[in-house]
């Protein structure tokens, strides 16, 4: 099914581009996510609507689409295809064709592809995210700090190719969080659980 990395990348992109936050909130009759809070289509912004169940479902969907893309590519065509699917799924979430290439910030999908490629690093990411989130209640800061450690952890575990790939993904994640970074420095970033 995956004769080369390009097909695996395209497969990953299509799975990654499914906008679960938009789909679930529309089904639930909630207003357009892009018009509230941060304008993001991910779970943190869904949480700002006050719908915790929808936020959890969005988080799970955005994470598992990344995991599915990587695991399917890995099983059918090996690690090279899995890496291509990793990049494709992440870019699909960030720049989905269905939403005119204006997607989410990628945290859940980052965790999902990491889980599929090397699960111990995904657990470490989640542990760091939870620690920072518990102490600061800033979702964005939690993701930024956890993502910084991921390439280092992958390198330390003996996976330099994965480390390089996730260094690229981390740069993209930070780019998508540039407005959050500005708000963090300005002291105006929204905290976890705050409604729009």
UniProtKB/Swiss-Prot annotation:
GO CC annotations, alphabetized: plasma membrane
Membrane topology, from the record: Multi-pass membrane protein
Keyword set, alphabetical order: Cell inner membrane, Cell membrane, Lipid biosynthesis, Lipid metabolism, Membrane, Phospholipid biosynthesis, Phospholipid metabolism, Transferase, Transmembrane, Transmembrane helix
GO terms (BP aspect): phospholipid biosynthetic process
Record's protein name: Glycerol-3-phosphate acyltransferase
Alphabetical list of PANTHER family matching this protein: GLYCEROL-3-PHOSPHATE ACYLTRANSFERASE-RELATED (PTHR30309:SF0), INNER MEMBRANE PROTEIN YGIH (PTHR30309)
Function description: Catalyzes the transfer of an acyl group from acyl-phosphate (acyl-PO(4)) to glycerol-3-phosphate (G3P) to form lysophosphatidic acid (LPA). This enzyme utilizes acyl-phosphate as fatty acyl donor, but not acyl-CoA or acyl-ACP.
Subunit structure of this chain's protein: Probably interacts with PlsX.
């Amino acid at each position: 099914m995956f004769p080369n990395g390009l097909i695996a990348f395209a497969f990953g992109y299509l799975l990654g581009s499914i906008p679960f936050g938009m789909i679930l909130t529309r089904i639930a009759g909630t207003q357009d996510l892009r018009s509230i809070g941060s304008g993001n289509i991910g779970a943190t912004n869904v949480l700002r609507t006050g719908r915790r169940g929808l936020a959890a479902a969005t988080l799970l969907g955005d994470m598992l689409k990344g995991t599915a893309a990587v695991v399917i590519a890995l099983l059918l065509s090996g690690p090279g295809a899995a890496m291509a699917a990793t990049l494709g799924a992440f870019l699909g979430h960030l720049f989905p064709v269905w939403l005119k290439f204006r997607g989410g910030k990628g945290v859940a999908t980052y965790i999902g592809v990491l889980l599929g490629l090397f699960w111990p690093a995904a657990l470490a990411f989640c542990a760091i995210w939870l620690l920072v989130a518990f102490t600061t209640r800033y979702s964005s800061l939690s993701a930024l700090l956890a993502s910084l450690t991921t390439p280092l952890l992958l390198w330390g575990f003996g996976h330099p190719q994965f480390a390089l790939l996730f260094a690229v993904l981390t740069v993209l994640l930070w780019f998508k969080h540039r407005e959050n970074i500005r708000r963090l420095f300005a002291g105006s970033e929204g905290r976890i659980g705050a409604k729009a």
